[in-house]
Amino acid sequence: MTGWTINAAELRIPRRSRIAAHRMIVIADPSGRAVRQLNGLASWFDNELHAWRHKPIGYLPTDRLRGYDTKTHPRTFMPINGAVLPDWNIAPAIATGAARVLTDDLTRDEVDLRLAPALDALRRINALARGPDGGAGLPYPFMGFGRNSNSFFATMLHAMGFDHPTFANAAWLVPGARGLLLPASEIR
């Protein structure tokens, strides 16, 4: 592979297991280093810090599902199954099928063009309920069973026109994997 890539990847729960997965969009630079992610995360607004915070899974009635771009919210960068530390190189994950290339050989500007419809969908998801920093998104389903972060991933795929990838040694539980958070006719 040459150039920038847009990829599908997972955070395994527990790490390196096949029990469950949180799926995400990962952008890698030409060296294969993951430099950006789009994630849907269980969130709550911290009134003391005046900022949204996130946690591994939602379980409180006040938890919200919001979308994040690590370009503007770097603390939402999640561990990537199969990637190599210290720089989150995803080439080994791609080689084993733990991550999938959605499109490759892109310039940085082409990445921005491909991400534009997904970022628009992210903003629209967050704006579904009033709240600070673009909105409060959607109620997070108890323990993630329902439309959740994997539904956010499915919505991002749909917005960019990508098919759902198949991961090697797929996780057994991926709730919300094919659900969309916005009507299909309104995405793109």
Residue ranges and their predicted role:
Residues 1-144, 159, 181-188:
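Non-catalytic ligand/cofactor/substrate-binding and regulatory segments of enzyme domains
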Residues 147-188:
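Active-site or metal-binding loop neighborhoods of secreted/extracellular toxin and effector enzymes
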